[in-house]
UniProtKB/Swiss-Prot annotation:
Family membership noted in the UniProt record: Belongs to the aspartate/ornithine carbamoyltransferase superfamily. ATCase family.
Protein's GO biological process: 'de novo' pyrimidine nucleobase biosynthetic process; 'de novo' UMP biosynthetic process; amino acid metabolic process
Pathway(s) where this gene product acts: Pyrimidine metabolism; UMP biosynthesis via de novo pathway; (S)-dihydroorotate from bicarbonate: step 2/3
Protein name: Aspartate carbamoyltransferase catalytic subunit
Length: 298
């Protein structure tokens, strides 16, 4: 059985294969109704717009159907049911499970109890592999991924999208530039793992120092829901912002990406520049998730 839990589970060849498959789906090279007898369960115990809707859209475009739980309050977890029992039960209803959960490691746990494939749609501050695939796909549409300079800006401590993407980029000989507010730096264990994988990781005190070196700037929001209290959040909430003035002198091919939603860290005026690619990035979630759903249920 094929689970999609962590980027650590993939070789580069696996990622390239899925990206190639997504390209085929994106260009219409697939048979309608490929999953017309299949059903996916979307279990989202944290808020989601893009991930949940793009999985549902992907399944519909493949001819399949989806059922969903959109909050803890709408599930039997409020009655004391364990995640393991929930997964056991839902495995009897669907051909695959897409899970988002606030606890890191929840998707791995779910895969141990599921009798159908599990796709991790985000587990706390852990991993978000389908987001990473669409990030890579978006980059690859404009430039080869090998050997480029990528900057990660924002909440690198709690940001699962940053963790997943950094690990994936380590397979492509990328130089990684990290820019984070004090206290939100990349966790030491992940930074060490990246360097052990042979990745060059360069830390910068601010985005101004790094931005002219970059081919890709990946911006993330400060995640209020991960902070222990409001005071800690507000201490760093407005510590960086991408504006059009900041883009003077950057590389012509610079791409600005963001997993969305944003919360003020990118000025809306940037949307009108050729560097802004985050809405295209969001759109790419559909072909990527079509490829993933087909792969686990074919």
């Amino acid at each position: 059985m094929y689970h999609i839990i962590s980027i650590r589970d993939f070789e580069r060849s696996d990622l390239d294969y899925l990206l190639d498959r997504a390209q085929e789906f994106d260009t219409g090279k697939y048979r309608p109704g490929m999953l017309d007898d299949k059903l996916v369960a979307l279990l989202f115990f944290e808020p989601s717009t893009r991930t949940r809707m793009s999985f549902a859209t992907a399944m519909a475009r493949l001819g399949g159907r989806s059922i969903s739980v959109d909050s803890v309050e709408a599930s039997s977890i409020v009655k004391g049911e364990t995640l393991a029992d929930t997964i056991r039960v839902v495995s009897g209803y669907a051909d695959a499970i897409v899970l988002r959960h606030p606890k890191e490691g929840a998707a791995r746990l779910a895969s141990e109890f599921a009798t159908v494939p599990v796709i991790n749609a985000g587990d706390g501050a852990g991993q978000h592999p389908s987001q990473t695939l669409l990030d890579l796909y978006t980059i690859r549409q404009s430039m080869p991924v090998d050997g480029i300079d990528v900057g990660l800006l924002g909440d690198l401590r709690y940001g699962r999208t940053a963790h997943s993407l950094a690990l994936a980029l380590s397979l492509y000989g990328v130089t990684l530039h990290t820019i984070a507010p004090v206290g939100l730096e990349m966790p030491a264990n992940i930074a060490l793992e990246l360097r052990e994988r042979g990745m060059e990781v360069v830390e910068h005190p601010n985005v101004e120092e790094a931005i002219r070196e970059l081919d890709v700037l990946y911006v993330t929001r400060i995640q209020r829901e991960r902070f222990p209290d409001s005071a800690s959040y507000y201490n760093v909430a407005s510590s960086y912002r991408i504006t059009t003035d900041l883009l003077d002198g950057v590389k012509e091919r610079l791409m600005i990406l963001h997993p969305l939603p944003r919360a003020g860290e990118i000025d809306p005026a940037v949307d009108r520049t050729p560097y802004a690619r985050y809405f295209e990035q969001a759109r790419n979630g559909v072909p990527i998730r079509m490829a993933l759903l087909h792969e686990v249920m074919k």
